[in-house]
Amino acid sequence: MNYREYQQIVRRKSRQISVGPVKVGGDAPITVQTMTNTPTDDVAATVAQIHRAERAGVDIVRVSCPDEAATAALADIVRQVNVPIVADIHFHYRRAIEAAKAGAACLRINPGNIGSAERVREVVAAARDHGCSIRIGVNAGSLEKHLLEKYGEPNPDALVESALEHAKILQDHDFHEFKISVKASDVFMAVAAYQQLAEVCDHPLHIGITEAGGRRTGTVKSSIGLGSLLWAGIGDTMRVSLSAEPEEEVAVGWDILKSLGIRHRGVRVISCPSCARQGFNVIDTVAQLEDRLAHIEEPITLSIIGCVVNGPGEALMTDLGVTGGGNGRHMVYAAGKTDHTIEGAAMIDHVVELVEQRAARLREEKAAAKQAAE
């Protein structure tokens, strides 16, 4: 947890809604989302992909429902997974009604393209009857014609105006279980739009940089955009959009939250870039450790530093640490203090064992605390 004054983030106050059993907004944890890319009517493939995202730590998963076959498959999908499902709906209001009946926890819609006021009323009624929340999803790439004519191009003002227009549609139907997103592929536009929206409403915000790109460029863009917003206290749920597998989006989302001290899950490795002073191959060691420790869910910090220039100092701030030494022997730190040395050949196996032992202790402590509270 953050404990230094300069690490504190003051989160924007927002109302709280429910996405199935998961709370979004208010004082609820900032949740990590992803979206499947399988054909939704391929139930086996979609469920398998969601299970991989679950293992990566996802809180909420969105699936596209472009046709009746997709919504027909939704009930089977919902029954086989352990996280709430958001149905992504565009244009076809009947798909939203079908998804609500099938057990979707949330409907991602754009009230402006669902159709007439009567159709919007039917969608809202279905959401209310089946306990669904709604996400108003505004995107710079699909703004309404009248806003493009008014502003000349997509910009933050247009995104916010679209969002507020759609929010009013739901509010006019006395429906308030909704969250809002105003996404753009341009980081400046997206951040400015979310900043403006955060000033004029208290609805929970789903943040994201849309069409961010591939694994490397998308991670960088999302980290800049989402990191800036989260640092400013803006955002109640988030998706990192990558041209990559959903579980990779989840991993990056968690890394952003961990980097800001907002949520903690798994092993956070602090490592040096390596140089000629390294006492062991830092790059290879870190790659192996990250792979072998990927199954750990308990929050543990681990420093892997190749020499004594920064190693002891970094170890002061981590649960476990290794600093490269001479003659193939390296110092191991526990809770910031020197503990013992280890030979290079055995180091990786030894560190994995230490981390797994600490994770087991944390699980035992958590179970004991839970039992004591009951």
From Swiss-Prot:
Annotated S-S bridges: none
GO biological process terms, semicolon-separated: isopentenyl diphosphate biosynthetic process, methylerythritol 4-phosphate pathway; terpenoid biosynthetic process
Swiss-Prot/TrEMBL keywords: 4Fe-4S, Iron, Iron-sulfur, Isoprene biosynthesis, Metal-binding, Oxidoreductase
Gene3D superfamilies in alphabetical order: Dihydropteroate synthase-like, Sulfite Reductase Hemoprotein, domain 1
Pfam (any one): GcpE
Natural source organism: Acidiphilium cryptum (strain JF-5)
GO molecular function: 4 iron, 4 sulfur cluster binding; 4-hydroxy-3-methylbut-2-en-1-yl diphosphate synthase activity (ferredoxin); 4-hydroxy-3-methylbut-2-enyl-diphosphate synthase activity (flavodoxin); iron ion binding
Protein name, per record: 4-hydroxy-3-methylbut-2-en-1-yl diphosphate synthase (flavodoxin)
Cofactor-binding details, from the entry: Binds 1 [4Fe-4S] cluster.
Annotated positions binding [4Fe-4S] cluster: 272, 275, 307, 314
Pathway(s) the chain acts in: Isoprenoid biosynthesis; isopentenyl diphosphate biosynthesis via DXP pathway; isopentenyl diphosphate from 1-deoxy-D-xylulose 5-phosphate: step 5/6
Function according to Swiss-Prot or TrEMBL: Converts 2C-methyl-D-erythritol 2,4-cyclodiphosphate (ME-2,4cPP) into 1-hydroxy-2-methyl-2-(E)-butenyl 4-diphosphate.
